[in-house]
């Protein structure tokens, strides 16, 4: 049986931590664990997911929940409540529902104070890892039999009815993920006609019916070239000389978005080496199976720009294709011949220096799973027996997650982000005395997860920004500062600092709070908006060079309304407690941030969400930021427009339901389901509360709260519904903890802001 291990790791030559592995979450298979009854419940959960996989595609993340609730002997002892038709919500009913949610959620806290959860969803995360392990000869050691079984389960569970796989679990089938999933199945031992429900045959038919893998997007062309199932001459150039360009040029690594930089860093190394893995009998078979013509007869030069229409979200502009063609025809032939190949060798050396720097400063976690696999493979190409590659191997478990739909690869984990939101939700419940241990543990996790230092050495030369005082998305070992993660964690620390230490633990040292403020202030742009990782400011026209076909806005840093709002809320609270610290800068930040939020409002009154689905998500953040400075419906036109948008999109059942299609389409799309989405309902409910809706007309709030209460499950949990996370416009993320955090938080804010406080015996 699979078991989740928390904060486990043993320092050695290849594995080390900056904070004793706080926040680390790894899965291990124990063949002797679990009773027959426990194993039967897991199988029941797997079967239930399989039977309903086309109805609700995100899993309910049940395996670790079953484990934690069992280990803590949790039983819901608070009676369930429902709001009948025509019945008003009493303070007692709201209190009972809230307490049930809080007691259940508190039982899910890990021993180190965070809440584990899946953060995955894209279907291109896992196959490259399997391919990398196959190429390097570590497949069977990294993925023993039970791992392979769960990986295949995941692939089967998320195959679409037409035989393909989407870019993410709710998406339409794409060539990229269908081909990668097919290859993954074949590497893991399935035959060309094998797999559950003829998975391989159906996938291959989809591939051939849609033009074969010559139409795979650029990332797919790169991975297939590495594997030996495509030819490098059929890819667009990724010259490593990019890393030795003079800094005054507009196209320079220092001006790139950090994710783009750290992905194309190892990718350009592998391209510069023209690395190809061993050509095994399986690779030769794939060359036959994936094409609708003989492999040796393919005109590779003509397929560089070919991309299946199902994958094409961002068509390359003419100027970009012209650049690729110029590099392909003129530059590459020179750089691969003497004497210019000396420059190529120098570029490869510098590129690998940057790869090692990023690896070391993230404890070999890297920024995320896409970079992780590419950097790991680059290290192996440099030295198959070297320490760098072995350190990468030691961190693979940090990315793997097991649920009832199988084993997948996470982006990097969302431990700090989830914990900060969870703590604020619990504090809003005003149950501090009852959940003191939960709050203490959560507070301790937040304090121990703060990044204590800047990147090593002369980090600016390595294109890095300050990180001391920040919080990463996952844990301290990751080390990468994120503005909204920092702001939300700072809010928690400030809230805790005003509470009795015997209830929530000792407050954080003010100096460390100042460090957090320094990071936040450093990331504001001239337009008042806040970027996520590093300061924005590179020319917008560089986005014309976006080399991907299925993402948008990946070349440079951009400002985000969510990050800006989080920072405003944190700094307003900070200013009240520390009015003398960098007063002018804090005031200017807040004023400019508010102006940015007002400036980027959509004509319909909403805001576009960059990290959640979509206009409802961003509207909740924006209204929270405006409310923090005293702006409401009565004194702010932007708030009035936003309220009109939210009330206009409220559904007949009292909730809200926004389709993920809003994100790529950039217009509001309603869910095509009869039911509303509870997470989005909570966002809208809290946004309206921020606006002052309770003083105008509380009826929309009552209707929303009724929906949340009536959908609560017997044990205090809430059901998993549609996916609610997103990145880069077009790819969705499943944050499995959202279904607990936000309905709980929404009910808590409703109870303390809408209902008249009364005391009741609710048990």
UniProtKB/Swiss-Prot annotation:
PFTB repeats lie at residues 148-189, 513-558, 590-630, 639-680, 701-742. InterPro entries: SQ_cyclase_C (IPR032696), SQ_cyclase_N (IPR032697), Squalene_cyclase (IPR018333), Terpene_synthase_CS (IPR002365), Terpenoid_cyclase/PrenylTrfase (IPR008930). Keywords: Isomerase, Repeat. Multifunctional oxidosqualene cyclase producing delta-amyrin (48%), alpha-amyrin (18%), beta-amyrin (13%) and 4 other minor triterpenes. Its EC number is 5.4.99.55, 5.4.99.40, 5.4.99.39. Pfam families: SQHop_cyclase_C (PF13243), SQHop_cyclase_N (PF13249). This is Delta-amyrin synthase. The active site is at residue 484. SUPFAM superfamilies: Terpenoid cyclases/Protein prenyltransferases. It catalyses: (S)-2,3-epoxysqualene = delta-amyrin; (S)-2,3-epoxysqualene = beta-amyrin; (S)-2,3-epoxysqualene = alpha-amyrin. One of its GO terms (biological process) is triterpenoid biosynthetic process. GO terms for cellular component: lipid droplet. Expressed in the leaves and in the epidermal cells but not in the inner tissues of the fruit. The keyword Transmembrane helix does not apply.
């Amino acid at each position: 049986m699979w078991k989740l291990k928390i904060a486990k790791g043993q320092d050695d030559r290849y594995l080390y931590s900056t904070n004793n592995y706080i926040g680390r979450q790894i899965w291990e298979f124990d063949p002797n664990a679990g009773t027959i009854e426990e194993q039967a419940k897991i199988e029941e959960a797997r079967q239930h997911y399989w039977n309903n996989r086309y109805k609700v595609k995100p899993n309910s993340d049940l395996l670790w929940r079953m484990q934690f609730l069992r280990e803590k002997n949790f039983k819901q002892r608070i009676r369930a409540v429902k709001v009948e038709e025509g019945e008003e919500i009493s303070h007692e009913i709201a209190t009972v529902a809230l307490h049930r949610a809080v007691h259940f959620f508190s039982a899910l806290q890990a021993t180190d104070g965070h809440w584990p959860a899946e953060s995955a969803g894209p279907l291109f995360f896992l196959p490259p890892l399997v391919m990398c392990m196959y190429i390097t000869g570590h497949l069977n050691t990294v993925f023993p039999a039970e791992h392979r079984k769960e990986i295949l389960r995941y692939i089967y569970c998320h195959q679409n009815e037409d035989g393909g796989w989407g870019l993410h679990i709710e998406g339409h089938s794409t060539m990229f993920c269908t081909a990668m999933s097919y290859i993954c199945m074949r590497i893991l031992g399935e035959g060309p006609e094998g797999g559950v429900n003829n998975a391989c045959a159906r996938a291959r038919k989809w591939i051939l019916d849609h033009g074969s893998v010559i139409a795979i997007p650029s990332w797919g062309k790169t991975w297939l070239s590495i594997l030996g199932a495509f030819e490098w001459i059929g890819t667009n150039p990724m010259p490593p000389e990019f890393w030795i360009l003079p800094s005054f040029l507009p196209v320079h690594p220092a001006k790139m978005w950090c994710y783009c930089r750290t992905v194309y860093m190892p990718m350009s190394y592998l391209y510069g080496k023209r690395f190809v893995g061993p050509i095994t009998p399986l690779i030769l078979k794939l060359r036959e199976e994936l094409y609708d013509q003989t492999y040796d007869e393919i005109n590779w030069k003509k397929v560089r720009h070919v991309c299946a229409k199902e994958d094409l979200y961002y068509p390359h502009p003419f100027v970009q294709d012209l650049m690729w063609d110029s590099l392909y025809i003129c530059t590459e032939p020179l750089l691969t011949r003497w004497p210019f190949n000396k420059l190529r060798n120098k570029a490869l050396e510098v590129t690998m220096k940057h790869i090692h720097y990023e690896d070391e400063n993230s404890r070999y976690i890297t920024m995320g799973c896409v970079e992780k696999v590419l950097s790991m493979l680059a290290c192996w190409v440099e030295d198959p027996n070297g320490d760098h590659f072995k350190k990468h191997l030691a961190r693979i478990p940090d990315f793997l997650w097991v649920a009832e739909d199988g084993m997948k690869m996470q982006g990097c984990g969302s431990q700090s982000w989830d914990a900060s939101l969870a703590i604020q939700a619990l504090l809003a419940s005003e149950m501090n005395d009852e959940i003191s241990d939960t709050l203490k543990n959560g507070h301790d996790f937040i304090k121990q997860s703060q990044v204590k230092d800047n990147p090593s050495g002369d980090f600016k030369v390595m294109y890095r920004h300050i990180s001391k005082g920040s919080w990463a998305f996952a844990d301290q070992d990751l080390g990468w500062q994120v503005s909204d993660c920092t702001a939300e964690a700072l809010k928690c620390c400030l809230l805790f600092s005003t509470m009795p230490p015997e209830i929530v633990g000792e407050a954080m040292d003010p100096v460390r709070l100042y460090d957090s403020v320094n990071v936040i202030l450093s990331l504001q742009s001239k337009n008042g908006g806040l970027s996520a990782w590093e300061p924005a400011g590179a020319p917008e026209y560089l986005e014309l060079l976006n080399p991907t076909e299925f993402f948008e806005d990946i070349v440079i840093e951009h400002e985000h309304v969510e990050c800006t709002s989080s920072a405003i809320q944190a700094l307003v609270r900070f200013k009240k407690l520390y009015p003398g610290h960098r007063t002018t800068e804090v005031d200017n930040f807040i004023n400019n941030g508010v102006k940015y939020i007002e400036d980027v409002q959509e004509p319909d009154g909403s805001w576009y969400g960059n990290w959640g689905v979509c206009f409802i998500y961003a509207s909740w953040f924006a209204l929270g930021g405006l409310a923090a400075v005293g702006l409401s419906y009565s004194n702010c036109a932007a708030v009035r427009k936003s309220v009109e948008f939210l009330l206009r999109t409220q559904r007949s059942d009292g909730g809200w339901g926004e389709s993920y299609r809003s994100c790529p389409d950039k217009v509001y799309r309603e869910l095509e389901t009869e039911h509303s989405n509870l997470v989005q309902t909570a966002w809208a409910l809290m946004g309206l509360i921020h606006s002052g809706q309770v003083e105008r007309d509380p009826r929309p709030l009552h209707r929303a709260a009724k929906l949340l209460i009536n959908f609560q499950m017997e044990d205090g949990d809430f059901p998993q519904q549609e996916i609610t996370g997103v990145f880069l416009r077009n790819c969705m993320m499943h944050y499995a903890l959202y279904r607990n955090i936000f309905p709980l938080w929404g009910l808590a804010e409703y109870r303390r802001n809408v209902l008249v406080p009364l005391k009741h015996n609710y048990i």
